[in-house]
């Protein structure tokens, strides 16, 4: 049942369309409250959101359900997803809740949960919550009238997060003299990200810091790095930072205006952490989408790359299991486990800036250590989510491309965990061939899964 409700990053969909409706949100609040109401202590929940107009109504619905279940709710207002993870830990809350659809347009929204340690919930916990929500006849074990929770707002949540991120930056270093362009996507980081960088001494040029409820991710943020790249060239900045709507993802632009993806940043950070002795087992965790060049880079530098399913939660699960300190996704989710329990765009930016400060070299030189194989990713909108093996034509097309790549490339097909899309990725040594292979495969997928 849970697969009808939760995807790879919580619940997500179009506002006022199932499952992103107020009644589902109310039941989610009730179910999560009951699931995490354990023991006799005062039960607390931290709720944050991004800047979407619909965030207000979902915040109210979730709060009502949680309070009805006996949980005390602490509302932070708009804050990055990793800030809610941090506050859940630091405030000793039982649960953290984020209302956001990340990089999606404002018409969408989503709900995801963190446990008391600041980690995203495992599938089993989500299954238990979903079972209660989807059971129309479920008998809710309400507390008596004295056991109902109350809701309060916390006014200094953003300041607490800024202090936390600054404490993850070496005390003997500053950002004085650096010119930084930061694009906050008119999202959750619109206040905290520029302030944190300015307090560390940087000269900050702001983009996407005027949210109006409907302009989140609109021609800005991590999905539009060309915007920050143009600004970097215009103001001759040292680096550009593009965050997504909930600021758990980061895309970086060097001083020339060249966009660097998550793989290039992971290579840079892994090398620095290995040199500092901060990467246990010289292990980096990434997903199936990461470029083959990253795998070869780690091997050539005495390290190893462990691949997981796509989704930063699966990266984090593998990091916990293996004791890894660095992991991430090509899309820009970067996890520094020494400091955080989830992807954090601002924290990742500070780790990159630390390397720039310590090396005193431009980012273009530092990031040049990884040359990715040409890779083409095509998103195909689909009506059916059938197992690929049930469509022989797809398997035959994949086999033909793999044969032509001759072991010097990869083909990956996967369904999006949050949208009605099939992602077709081809990687190889020759850009023109890679593009042709991907386009041909995408046509087959579209035809077979309509």
UniProtKB/Swiss-Prot annotation:
The modification Phosphoserine is found at residue 102. Its EC number is 5.4.2.10. It is an enzyme of class 5 (isomerase). Activated by phosphorylation. Keywords: Isomerase, Magnesium, Metal-binding, Phosphoprotein. Mg(2+) binds at residues 102, 244, 246, 248. It holds the Pfam family PGM_PMM_I. The keyword Isomerase applies. SUPFAM superfamilies: Phosphoglucomutase, C-terminal domain, Phosphoglucomutase, first 3 domains. GO terms for biological process: carbohydrate metabolic process; peptidoglycan biosynthetic process; UDP-N-acetylglucosamine biosynthetic process. It comes from the Bacteria. The active site is at 102 (phosphoserine intermediate). One of its GO terms (cellular component) is cytosol. One of its GO terms (molecular function) is phosphoglucosamine mutase activity. Its cofactor is Mg(2+). The keyword Nucleotidyltransferase does not apply. InterPro entries: A-D-PHexomutase_a/b/a-I, A-D-PHexomutase_a/b/a-I/II/III, A-D-PHexomutase_a/b/a-II, A-D-PHexomutase_a/b/a-III, A-D-PHexomutase_C, A-D-PHexomutase_C_sf, A-D-PHexomutase_CS, Alpha-D-phosphohexomutase_SF. It catalyses: alpha-D-glucosamine 1-phosphate = D-glucosamine 6-phosphate. Binds 1 Mg(2+) ion per subunit. Catalyzes the conversion of glucosamine-6-phosphate to glucosamine-1-phosphate. Belongs to the phosphohexose mutase family. PANTHER family: PHOSPHOGLUCOMUTASE (ALPHA-D-GLUCOSE-1,6-BISPHOSPHATE-DEPENDENT) (PTHR42946:SF1), PHOSPHOHEXOSE MUTASE (PTHR42946). This is Phosphoglucosamine mutase. It comes from Desulfovibrio desulfuricans (strain ATCC 27774 / DSM 6949 / MB).
